[in-house]
Amino acid sequence: MAVVTMKQLLDSGTHFGHQTRRWNPKMKRFIFTDRNGIYIIDLQQTLTYIDKAYEFVKETVAHGGTVLFVGTKKQAQESIAAEATRVGMPYVNQRWLGGMLTNFTTVHKRLLRLKELEAMEQTGGFEGRTKKEILMLTREMTKLDRTLGGIRDMAKVPSAVWVVDTNKEHLAVAEARKLNIPVIAILDTNCDPDLVDYPIPGNDDAIRSAALLTKVVASAVAEGVQARAGLSSDKDAKPEAGAGEPLAEWEQELLSQAAPAAEAAPAAEAQAAPAAEAPAAEAPSTEA
């Protein structure tokens, strides 16, 4: 079964690029044609590259890796947060702070400070302080949560980064490349494909397009989690370092939802078989 269909891509407007005067010549090979001054992206190539990116993300997570979701533009903020949260991955959908990857040691200290402030608030640590002190601590906590809340549980730099709009997120892309972290990203017609390891040619400005492709990456993460727990149908996958790590609560929940569905299918077939063999009841005669 295809990861995503051509119709879904068309319906979400993934094929629309930028105006012909706003483009990167390196993207020429991904362009199908132009209509009324707008480039049309070759969705056949998009489907091919989606499969490659999907497989990479799935294998990365299956072997214990994490994927950082990045998208701070207005069109991507909601889907980035929703999909990353759905699969328990870290995300950045507000402002990218310089050094978030290359200076992660300092960022991690700020994360510890955020957790410290939250613990103080929950355990009554603010009691006995002046109103001004409480206000300052609350403001600090709110600011940290807004900028770092999406990566609060990220204990180390990610194994890969998913990016919506590489031009806007050029700092994130540059830091990932500096640390040799693979970059998976939507490539619009004004982007540089040389900066991305796993490109997906598509529209990074439309809300539905960004949401669809982000959902595809999140689904690959979910499948990787299941593979890590041994539920994958691929029995030939070789375990790597990190594959035996204990699963987090969100991963256990994801797997608990997948297991009953897998068990229900054989049971339904077993019930259907006797029903098919039983003779059909004769309809009562309508004759007088």
Curated annotation (Swiss-Prot):
Keyword Ribosomal protein appears in the UniProt entry: yes
Region Disordered, annotated ranges: 228-288
Chain intervals with Low complexity compositional bias: 257-288
InterPro entries (UniProt xref): Ribosomal_uS2 (IPR001865), Ribosomal_uS2_bac/mit/plastid (IPR005706), Ribosomal_uS2_CS (IPR018130), Ribosomal_uS2_flav_dom_sf (IPR023591)
Protein family (similarity comment): Belongs to the universal ribosomal protein uS2 family.
HAMAP family: Ribosomal_uS2_B
UniProt name for this protein: Small ribosomal subunit protein uS2
Species: Rhodococcus opacus (strain B4)
Classification of source organism: Bacteria, Bacillati, Actinomycetota, Actinomycetes, Mycobacteriales
